[in-house]
């Protein structure tokens, strides 16, 4: 297996495609089998995908829009004309396929269709892939995961992120060989010939404050412990959230999301987070994940320092899960929450440096998403917010 990355800050899609494809071709000695593509909304143009396909014939493309920039082992990349980042993978002894499906009104069906098409593209119909990489718009993630698992089962790690934009205005898009897509699920199935490792964590810790969701609907928490959810959350945050009344609370709630225990490792709880986005006039909280009555929610807290260090620690865990030292890594993919990135934007060079320390010399591509998907240690696939999800090869 060979892995290479490239980026471009060019002011036109065709030039960005030329620069990145030329760099990949030079490093890999030809076109990759799998091309992972992330770009800011400014560069989400059909011409970008068309030019990449022309320059790298045969490469199967998967990816989506990334909030404000991308990152590689060369640094954090953003510019006035947007940014493009690519990772190319060559693995003659492995198999890879990408499939896409329109979301429609049934996310589960779209996830099932996309993964079935990906298996056909890989030439591995009806087999269970080693890994799955996914990209979809925000808001449908649990359904997409359920659909993928309805085809391949629940034991295959599903890793990825929900496409993002700059202003939470719906400008997010998905990428596949067909072009720039809107409201689609794009799935890659991976049968790598090398070792692999995956990890899914956050940079937050529980505060000791928790409650039971006693009323909920889809992605709204109406009551916690039979009290208005906003009132409880406002008390937990000591009035920081809710002091201005109803409205958007996304930025102010970033340091204090809600967490649910997804699994335990040697008695240590592993949390998946939900980011409160809106405080309703009736005291309800709207999240970026589904929530159910009976869920126990913990108020979590994270600092800029913990968010900066977490990406490297997740890479460490992914390599350990794969059974090799970070220095022996061939490369990897990193999904880093867009909200966390905005919270520590001035320190993104430090985030990149933490990843470099964890797998020195290895290429990687990172995107900033509005929802993260990953596998907890027992291969329990989950969707969360404010998380870091990583896939490494060694």
Predicted regions span which residues?
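Small-residue-enriched flexible segments
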Residues: 1-34, 38-55, 59-345, 349-362, ...
């Amino acid at each position: 297996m060979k892995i290479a990355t490239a980026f471009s800050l060019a002011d036109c899609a065709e030039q960005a495609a030329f620069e990145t494809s030329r760099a990949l071709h030079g490093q890999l000695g030809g076109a990759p089998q799998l091309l992972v593509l992330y770009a800011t909304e400014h560069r989400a143009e059909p011409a970008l995908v068309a030019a990449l396909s022309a320059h790298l014939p045969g490469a199967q493309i998967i990816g989506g829009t990334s909030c404000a920039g991308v990152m590689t082992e060369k640094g954090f990349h953003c510019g006035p004309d947007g940014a493009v980042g690519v990772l190319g993978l060559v693995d003659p002894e492995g198999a890879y396929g990408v499939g896409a499906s329109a979301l429609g009104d049934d996310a589960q069906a779209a996830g099932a269709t996309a993964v079935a098409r990906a298996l056909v593209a890989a030439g591995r119909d009806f087999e269970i892939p080693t890994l799955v990489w996914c990209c979809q718009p925000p808001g449908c993630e649990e359904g997409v995961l359920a659909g993928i698992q309805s085809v391949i089962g629940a034991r295959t790690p599903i890793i990825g992120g929900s496409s993002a934009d700059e202003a939470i205005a719906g400008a997010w898009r998905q990428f596949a060989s067909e072009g720039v897509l809107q409201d689609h699920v794009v799935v890659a199935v991976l049968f790598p010939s090398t070792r692999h490792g995956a990890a899914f964590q956050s940079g937050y810790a529980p505060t000791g404050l928790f409650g039971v969701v006693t009323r909920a609907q889809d992605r709204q928490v109406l009551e916690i412990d039979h009290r208005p959810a906003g009132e409880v959350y406002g008390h937990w945050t000591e009035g920081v959230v809710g002091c201005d009344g109803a409205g958007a609370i996304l930025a102010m709630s970033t340091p204090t999301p809600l967490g649910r225990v997804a699994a335990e490792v040697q008695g240590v709880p592993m949390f998946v987070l939900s980011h409160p986005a809106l405080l309703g006039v009736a005291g309800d909280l709207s999240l970026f994940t589904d929530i159910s009555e009976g869920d126990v929610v913990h108020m979590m807290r994270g600092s800029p320092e913990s968010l900066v260090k977490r990406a490297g620690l997740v890479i460490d865990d992914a390599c350990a899960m794969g059974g090799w030292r970070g220095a022996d890594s061939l490369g990897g993919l990193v999904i880093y929450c867009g909200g966390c990135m905005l919270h520590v934007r001035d320190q993104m060079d430090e985030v990149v440096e933490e990843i470099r320390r964890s797998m020195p010399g290895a290429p990687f591509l990172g995107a900033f998403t509005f929802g993260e998907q990953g596998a907890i240690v027992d291969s329990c696939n989950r969707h969360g917010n404010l998380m870091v999800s990583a896939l490494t090869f060694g």
